[in-house]
């Protein structure tokens, strides 16, 4: 037993395992399986591996329902990231991760290490990372602590992403009071690779070596997995020791060396895995489990940056910029030399065994000896679920916006943080560092050129959690649909999904119901779009003092554009172009931005979503884009038609003159399955013939500063310059206000 550690009997009697997240039943199960009391280190490694953050023991029964295979899928859930075939022996690799709890405690480091962790997932698969996107949720901007979190998170993402040289190309940011105590920091990374470079995280081959590479191990992030598997209490002291500290310059060295090793020594590399949640413990044990093997580690060999670290600390540390490689026996020196030439630690710390045991040695003592399969398969929990009481209380009556002064309503709407331009935040991110970004932040989706080809990859993150609060299943369907519309607006065809499932405590039957219904809704539309869910992340226990966030399943989506010369942008391009609305507008106000703005809350039954209308609208855009008939395309979402029109005008610095056969309120309706597009006069006839009765001509793009909108009840004039100023400066003004 290591000095100052509790004895097995003291572990049992003190019940420290409960503090670490194990239940009484789980501890008893461990005792039964081992036929003895687990020691301090063994109890610790079970607490890490059986945490919800690592094991998904509570969410896995639901996650198994995800549809995750079609002819493009080369790697689905279960590895570091998902992989899709994009033709020409190339593949796109992508995944999303969350760093919610750490970003609340230490906003800068929490967000920065979220970027670092997801990038390692990408390059551990053999792919060169090409882009990062962020899906962020914060409390209201009139809260001083929220401003502190926003500043720290934005700086952390920029500080890490810019330094490592991977462009941050897009994402979305929302603000709602429910996130004040639980901000959400979801990061999606995308990589590109040749298919023959694909790696997996496995430890097979008896006697093969386990090589530790990268940064030294410290005490940062210990218990990070357990920390992310519990809800907050505002009365509790923040656990800063559970937050990792990142070094992007070191990460760049690790990334480059890892990709070089794969290029030059793929014949001797058996497996690669990032040390993420639960650190060395999770990466090594999961690699053994995938191969049905055992592992023997000598912890004396683990590089340490702090003195006196215990086996418990060495195994559960979540120090950043570390990888595990499994290399063929006798071939280790080539890998060691490569990493050491980059001034990185590279040392053999163990071997693959055939006994199915996870065995740890420290100072000539066996400090852990447990079955790999048992360690890596936490007992699943099928939890009870019940429809939230609020849903039964919502009426089907749609909220009626107050249209007393339409012009003022528009200007006030543009100043709302969820609607207003995020340019003052995105400007901190380097979106052009690799010079392949064709559509930068601020458009519907980012577009990245694939070098030496005509192709491009479109990518986006989307979710409107207010919709899910009103109807989890329909809201989730709409999240997938909106992501797809954003991809389609660039001209690309959606090909796959990664998810970031952010929810409250699954121990609450109402929250578990929300999770179940959200997954069902995602599946519903994903199957129809032929976009398999190939990777993802679950972040539960997003609660503070019993107050849960809205159900927030972030949808990360990637699309493929076969010919980048057909790419379409959000901005109106030239005066005289015809403006069209694709799709029908209905009474869709419950859960809308105008409802929140005018009442301070959202309520009521969510408006309808029609799958067939959605697919038809998207197909119209794809068809006319393929014929090069569009000068611009923009999907409609928060804020409705008026916001979509103004965003296209602002992006192109052009005005417009439109007439709509609708009452004023419909300018703010958030009916899904709609786009605003612009078409050159010479293409008008062909466009209308192809699009059919799903489009309505609204008016024309103009070259002057005036925006003219005629409805059945009003004539509205706006100044492009003054309106754009409100849209662009509102968030910066709110952040800087005392």
UniProtKB/Swiss-Prot annotation:
State the superkingdom: Bacteria
> Family, per the entry?
Belongs to the FGAMS family.
Can you say what this protein is called?
A: Phosphoribosylformylglycinamidine synthase subunit PurL
Listed binding positions for Mg(2+) 2 are: 121, 274
State its role: Part of the phosphoribosylformylglycinamidine synthase complex involved in the purines biosynthetic pathway. Catalyzes the ATP-dependent conversion of formylglycinamide ribonucleotide (FGAR) and glutamine to yield formylglycinamidine ribonucleotide (FGAM) and glutamate. The FGAM synthase complex is composed of three subunits. PurQ produces an ammonia molecule by converting glutamine to glutamate. PurL transfers the ammonia molecule to FGAR to form FGAM in an ATP-dependent manner.
Enzyme class comes to ligase
- Record note on quaternary structure: Monomer. Part of the FGAM synthase complex composed of 1 PurL, 1 PurQ and 2 PurS subunits.
UniProt subcellular location = Cytoplasm
Q: Looking at the UniProt record for this protein, which Gene Ontology cellular component terms does it annotate, in alphabetical order?
A: cytoplasm
Chief location category: cytoplasm
Return the InterPro entries for the record.
PRibForGlyAmidine_synth_PurL (IPR010074), PurL_linker (IPR041609), PurM-like_C_dom (IPR010918), PurM-like_C_sf (IPR036676), PurM-like_N (IPR016188), PurM-like_N_sf (IPR036921)
Where does this protein act, in terms of pathway?
A: Purine metabolism; IMP biosynthesis via de novo pathway; 5-amino-1-(5-phospho-D-ribosyl)imidazole from N(2)-formyl-N(1)-(5-phospho-D-ribosyl)glycinamide: step 1/2
Question: Is ATP-binding given among the entry's keywords?
Answer: yes
UniProt keyword list: ATP-binding, Cytoplasm, Ligase, Magnesium, Metal-binding, Nucleotide-binding, Purine biosynthesis
Give the residues the record marks as binding ATP: 56, 95, 499, 536
**Which GO MF terms are attached to this record?**
ATP binding; magnesium ion binding; phosphoribosylformylglycinamidine synthase activity
- Residues that coordinate or bind substrate: 98-101, 120, 244, 318-320, 539
Q: Where does Mg(2+) 1 bind?
A: 97, 537
Which residues constitute the catalytic centre?
53, 99
Write out the GO biological process terms. 'de novo' IMP biosynthetic process
Which species is this UniProt entry from? Leuconostoc mesenteroides subsp. mesenteroides (strain ATCC 8293 / DSM 20343 / BCRC 11652 / CCM 1803 / JCM 6124 / NCDO 523 / NBRC 100496 / NCIMB 8023 / NCTC 12954 / NRRL B-1118 / 37Y)
The family database entries (Pfam families) matched by this protein are listed as:
AIRS (PF00586), AIRS_C (PF02769), FGAR-AT_linker (PF18072)
Protein encoded by which gene: purL
* EC number of this enzyme: 6.3.5.3
